[in-house]
Amino acid sequence: MNNIKLNKLLNEKYMLLKGIAKKFNYSDELLIMITLAYVAFYMSLGKDCDVPLYDLFNNVQIIYEEGNVNEIAIRHDLGPMPQGSVAVTAFIPNLKLFKDATQKQYPQAIILGTHVGDDLATPALKLEMLIHEVRHALMGYYNSHLLIDENTYYMRRGLHETYYFRDDNAKEKFSSKSNGTTLDEITNTYITELLVNKIMSFKENLIKNNKIRLYIDTLKTAQADKRYRAIGYNTEVRLLYPLLLNEEFINLVNKCQFYGNINLIKEFLENNIDSYTYDEFCQMLDQIFELEGKYAKNNNPKDTEEFVRIIKTVKGIIIEMNKKLLGSSRNLLKDWANLSISLEYTRNIYFYMNGIWTEYFETLIGVYKEFRFFAKLVNLSQ
């Protein structure tokens, strides 16, 4: 997009969102952040996301205050929130839907903090986490809820599917079952990274709005290639990194998560995975996420062995998919470089089990540096 068109788009959305900012008493900083988020989504998804974005920003309040999200949530009687987060979405399912399918969801609120724990969050990190949460809400705009029967309520947000079952004996009056939670987080993390880098690329243009230009100048990255890396690069993201680099897959996810045809994504994955179904693949990713916290916390050899076993299985699936999707030894080798990071990571998990803490953490730091190196190679080779 040329300089004239970008400035026109930024100015239009900035003026459009001024009314919403006044309604919720947003600061100038937050107004600029939602303007940049709006423009990034607009450039990614086109005009079809224009009305949904405005509707979301007009109805979903962003609570941006001093402190971390847990402190802010408690101040607003939203209950305790996960530690270590910069932003979270507060959501309460509307159980009246079991009796009246025309009911709407309760309004959501996005909580954005200035700190991660006790540490000050950088401008780039705050923008990333705000876009991450807004994208979750946007991907659920056309897929908010479906009352299947009087006892079953289905809700989808992106690739995250949840079934709520009416249970009058339970304290919350319902039970739930989810699928695709981790896969949704992985794709959301990666696409959010692309959006943040899109915004940071605006530095190459002459931005006429002084407030927006000054804010964009505060967005920094320590990466050698000057590209911002999302904070969510944990084990499951590294495992799927070769798949995330596949433009056909990412474009399909980006469009289908928004427009609602999740079956196209399921078919794409199942057509390229011979040995497992889509649901089984999603369940393994969820297990990796759950077990990664368990083995470090509980020092349980069984948890670690299961963790490594599932990682090896998923690694095999990704190799299988690469052979089908890429069909080129050059590309397969390129993406294997990224995949090998996860293999090194799992091999060195045993340092923890043997109590060699120093060696364990040195290994993790080495793997992180290796990941950055390979990510740079991938970018240079494209």
Explain the meaning of each model-derived region.
Residues R135-N143, I191-S201, L244-L245:
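Hydrophobic/aromatic-lined pockets within catalytic cores
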Residues V51-D55, L146-L159, F202-D217:
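Short, glycine/acidic-rich hinge or "gate" loops at secondary-structure transitions
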Residues L30-M33, A37, G117-K126, S175-T187, ...:
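Conserved aromatic-histidine-acidic binding/catalytic patches
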Residues F165-R238:
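Metalloprotease/metallohydrolase-associated module, dominated by Zn2+-dependent proteases
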Residues E66-L147, G158:
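Active-site scaffold of zinc-dependent metalloenzymes
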Residues A124, G140-I186:
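Post-HEXXH active-site segment of zinc metalloproteases
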Residues E12-E65, E71-A73, D77-T89, V134:
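Zn2+-dependent metallopeptidase catalytic core
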